Amino acid sequence: KIGVFGDNCSGKTTFLNLITGQIKPDTGTSVVGENTFFGYYMQNPEFPNTNLTVLEYIKEAAEYIVKNDGKNLSASAFLEEFGFEGKIQYSPVSTLSGGERKRLFLVRLLMSNPNFLILDEPTNDFDIFTMNILEQFLYSYKGCLLIVSHDRYFMDKVADTLFILEADGTISGFV
């Protein structure tokens, strides 16, 4: 579980985009293992079809998720864990607030059950409730985790190793 800090415009998001293959390196190559399945939480997620209901949007990723404790949860039950209870699951995505949409994007990402989770500024726009749920999920997450954030408190809680990406491209690390 690795956390990455850096000043604005130091290349943190570019680094994540290189890892996931969103962009190609100017030189060299980037190789991803054949069993690697990325879950990439971006700062500004896109919703191609906001007419879907919250539940339909999540079910596009999976009907069920097997949590780290072996518990099998339906998409609806997993949504409830993230505060999407009752009628809101049948509301169109277009009716959600910005923070709710980001939370929904996170739930869908986690429902896809990636083995390499990449979070780019995950604490932006999340309320305390969502932050607590995310922290609890990350504590028990068994895959690779790479987080970029300016939130040192959050990083100290969920990352094992922290790196600083300098504007000149150098990396310094500390635990």
Regions inferred by a protein language model and the residue ranges of each:
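ABC ATP-binding cassette signature C-motif
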Residues: 1-175
